[in-house]
Amino acid sequence: MANDFLFTSESVSEGHPDKVADQISDAILDAIFEQDPRSRVAAETLTNTGLVVLAGEITTNAHVDYIQVARDTIKRIGYDNTDYGIDYKGCAVMVCYDKQSNDIAQGVDHASDDHLNTGAGDQGLMFGYACDETPELMPAPIYYAHRLVERQAQLRKDGRLPFLRPDAKSQVTMRYVDGKPHSIDTVVLSTQHHPDQSETPTKMKASFNEAIIEEIIKPVLPKEWLKDTRYLINPTGRFVIGGPQGDCGLTGRKIIVDTYGGACPHGGGAFSGKDPSKVDRSAAYAARYVAKNIVAAGLARQCQIQVAYAIGVAQPMNITVYTEGTGVIPDAKIAELVREFFDLRPKGIIQMLDLLRPIYQKTAAYGHFGREEPEFTWEATTQAAALRAAAGL
């Protein structure tokens, strides 16, 4: 990639229909883990106008009121009025869970290559990434896209912008100069709203646009990056019909929003609703942990990690490090340090990151990475000093 370029990432709010589905799936996972953290969970959710469908595979000793968990999640998000297309009090909730296949369970319970360890719950490849563009070691476009929709929800819930409704999307186009963030070229923010905020079906009131720019966008974005920035606020105009009424929502459809905004590859596996025996989730978290510690240690300005697994096998098929020329030691040497300092077998990941806890609903909106939440152990840099010393820095 050239040193001077534009790069764009997007995010969506907790009221976006796909994120409603993700949050219900992870709320159900948490409710199960509160009683039985050894459960096997693959909870999928569909949301539509006035309807929630819960399906997937769950093996557990927990007794959970799945319908109530779904309703509570919808209420917390803010869908408490039939005018919004779904109302937690009156929506229909269908429960269609099966148990995990015994054929899968036998390979997960006892790895074929190490019977004292658990095997991977499926084959697949996962990526982790970190860079020095923000203090959180995340790419700037996705980091700030998340913060925009997070602030939209905050101002909606605390009543400062009472005309906002739950569904919203953001997009940040960053201008890079010499490979580093220089300024923000364009910000797009589309938010659901009360009907009285549009002048015509294709034009919003000037006061609405001003409130979005002054109360949501400018307080979030660094002032030094706002140089001739374009602001596109509800560019198609009226956005009253939204959430599950505007679009059917499904678990796992926002995998780029959930990760790095397109700044690195994605293996294709979604996170929400999956217990950590599923390496789609746990190994992606571990790969972020590894990459972040490498950058925090000063071994590279940016770092991409790929790991891959075979179902029922504990050891990863590969651990590949790519620093795009920013590493201070060879990538192959960094990969050796990864193998030395990080146990990337499924059971090792679960122990290393303490993943058998009800911590997942919080991950299901505003990004799984780059958030300094105490439960997000994969964001810690506890191995940075050891890596730096081992590299001789």
Swiss-Prot record:
ATP binds at H16, D167, A168, K169, R238, F239, D247, R253, K254, A270, K274. PROSITE patterns: ADOMET_SYNTHASE_1, ADOMET_SYNTHASE_2. Mg(2+) binds at D18. K(+) binds at E44. Binds 2 divalent ions per subunit. GO terms for molecular function: ATP binding; magnesium ion binding; methionine adenosyltransferase activity. Keywords: ATP-binding, Cytoplasm, Magnesium, Metal-binding, Nucleotide-binding, One-carbon metabolism, Potassium, Transferase. Pathway: Amino-acid biosynthesis; S-adenosyl-L-methionine biosynthesis; S-adenosyl-L-methionine from L-methionine: step 1/1. L-methionine binds at E57, Q100, D247, K278. The keyword Nucleotide-binding applies. Its cofactor is Mg(2+); K(+). It is found in: Cytoplasm. It comes from the Bacteria. CDD domains: S-AdoMet_synt. InterPro entries: ADOMET_SYNTHASE_CS (IPR022631), S-AdoMet_synt_C (IPR022630), S-AdoMet_synt_central (IPR022629), S-AdoMet_synt_N (IPR022628), S-AdoMet_synthetase (IPR002133), S-AdoMet_synthetase_sfam (IPR022636). Its EC number is 2.5.1.6. One of its GO terms (biological process) is S-adenosylmethionine biosynthetic process. Residues 100-110 are annotated as: Flexible loop. It catalyses: L-methionine + ATP + H2O = S-adenosyl-L-methionine + phosphate + diphosphate. GO terms for cellular component: cytoplasm. It is an enzyme of class 2 (transferase). Belongs to the AdoMet synthase family. Homotetramer; dimer of dimers. Catalyzes the formation of S-adenosylmethionine (AdoMet) from methionine and ATP. The overall synthetic reaction is composed of two sequential steps, AdoMet formation and the subsequent tripolyphosphate hydrolysis which occurs prior to release of AdoMet from the enzyme. HAMAP family: S_AdoMet_synth1. This is S-adenosylmethionine synthase. The gene is metK.
